[in-house]
Amino acid sequence: DPLRGMRQWQLHSTLSARARWSPLPDAQIIQDGYTADHPFPDVYRGRNCVMLGDLTCVPLSLPDGSLLVPAQSSVLGEDGALYAPPGGFTYTDAFIIRGQWRGGRLVWTGAARVAGDPARSTRGMIEPTLALLPDGRVLMAMRGSNHGAPHLPGYRWVSFSEDGGLRWTPPEPWTYADGELFYSPSACAQLLRHTDGALYWIGNIAPRNPNSNSPRYPLVIAEVDQRTGRLIRDGVRAIDDRRPGEDAALTLSNFYAREERETGGIALHLSRLFARSAGDWTADALVYHLTLNPGGAA
């Protein structure tokens, strides 16, 4: 039950003492001076939570050795209960947790929350994904939602940090590098830094205003302009799309992407859910192998 989890979920981490994976006992991620039941400012077990939104919420390592964990936290209202605007479902802020090495252990600090405007995104800021830009800024791209308010435009949202992930600019709709807005459903997405220096974003771009989570197709890969932190319009390439005869509920989402060391391409793990019908939760687990070309992927 997601609503029950929104009052309980917390994060744990584990470390390995060797180059080969040999995990040590896991531990709850808690800011110094806080407790298991109150692990961060404004987080209280039993009332709200801190969690990872999806597999695409990959931690980011900074040049100074710090680790940024792109999490999200449910929000408490003035009455102390879980907050959700009218017509919404769950409601979260993006919440980055910074880990720094001290004495052989990670010391955790919760960054300033990145809060959405419920009048523009009815589920707040969801499932952040991170990348480091050449000028030292950290780029965070986020999922929003117009759930329950389909008249609102469905966008991706973006925020930047200039201090290593502790303070963030107010979120704004993400655009192409030329400033034009694009539509995107409420779905996960991933920023992926390639060893050739390019920065890619993988997610769903919709041809018209989406309705909440739909449509979650086509799935695209796009190159990010690293000067502006915006998408390069000419660098958008389709990975997959709805095929003739497939249900409109098709979901090309909830994936995970990684660079393949052997080929330099990108492997994308995804199950094409609901291709036959909206209630059919059976689907093959697929791996897409993407060959990269300048300006995008083929």
Region locations from a protein language model:
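Beta-rich carbohydrate-recognition and catalytic domains
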Residues: 1-52, 60-123, 131-183, 195-198, ...
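Beta-propeller and closely related beta-sheet repeat lectin domains
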Residues: 55-58, 126-129, 187-190, 246-258
